[in-house]
A protein has these predicted regions:
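Histidine-centered nuclease catalytic patch
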Residues: 34-65, 74, 78
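Glycine-rich phosphate-binding P-loop
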Residues: 85-105
Length: 249
């Protein structure tokens, strides 16, 4: 019974009035709006900006075209501000990412940090927190928290704290964050200070991976500006300032 209901729901989401689809293509174009890593660019499917899970409707304002790859990869994540407003703080080991975020967080902000998950799991035992099993559990907790908060319709203020913006399942997480127009902060005290400060081989390896990525605040801002301009053209952002716009239906 439940399987049949899920199948019916999938069919319902895929059925769009051809007249609405024609209007969407005429107004917003027939190219993929998501631009996630691996995007083909083709407008192959109808995608709800506000998903069905958020009670999104079949309307020209709420539908854009998407390629099959991006539509599947999206997994009901929404643009920053269409549910939670998401900020990301990234940087090499020893950079004070949490301290940086704390200066900007609101009293009711939500923070997702691997180190905090590890601290809670180990009951503040630093040696235990460094164990592989605990670190893996913390990583899984981070991933689960991100998946939930990226899809929520609750207007939360969320701060994602992470060293490397990538994982096995999301090898180009940074590009995904840019596609969803997250507010991204790069905190990097510089390679010399980082390598002088790291005190173990694991952190040194992560630091080398970080600098091999070549991530800088300037490069991230340039990519975000380009993405924001695309979203303005698609009618999904207003004005010229990223992250704080809201769509009027």
């Amino acid at each position: 019974m439940m399987a049949a209901k899920r199948t019916a729901n999938r069919r319902r989401r895929q059925v769009i009035d051809p007249r609405i689809r024609a209007e969407v293509i005429a107004k917003w174009g027939d190219r993929c709006w998501l631009r996630l890593p691996g995007c083909t660019g083709a407008g192959e499917e109808d995608d709800h900006i506000v998903p069905w899970s958020h009670r999104g409707v079949d309307s020209v304002a709420n539908i854009r075209r998407a390629c099959k790859h991006c539509n599947a990869m999206r997994q009901d994540r929404v643009l920053s501000g269409y549910g939670a407003t998401i900020h990301c703080v990234i940087g090499p080991p020893t950079a004070d990412l949490i301290g940086y975020a704390a200066d900007y967080m609101r009293y009711d902000s939500v923070m997702v940090a691997h180190s905090e998950f590890a601290r809670v799991l180990s009951c503040d035992d630093d040696e235990l927190a460094g164990k592989k099993a605990v670190r893996l559990a913390a990583a899984l907790a981070w991933d689960a928290a991100y998946r939930q908060l990226a899809r929520t319709q609750t207007p939360l203020d969320v701060w994602l704290i992470r060293t490397l913006p990538r994982s096995r399942s999301h090898p180009d997480m940074l590009a995904e964050w840019i596609a969803f127009d997250y507010d991204i902060h790069v905190v990097d005290p510089g390679a010399e200070q980082v390598f002088d400060t790291v005190d173990n081989a694991a952190d040194e390896q992560v630091a080398r991976q970080w600098y091999a990525m070549g991530v800088t605040q300037a490069s991230v801002c340039a990519r975000l500006a380009q993405r924001h301009a695309q979203l303005v053209q698609l009618g999904l952002r207003n004005g010229t300032t990223a992250h704080d716009d809201s769509l009027e239906w």
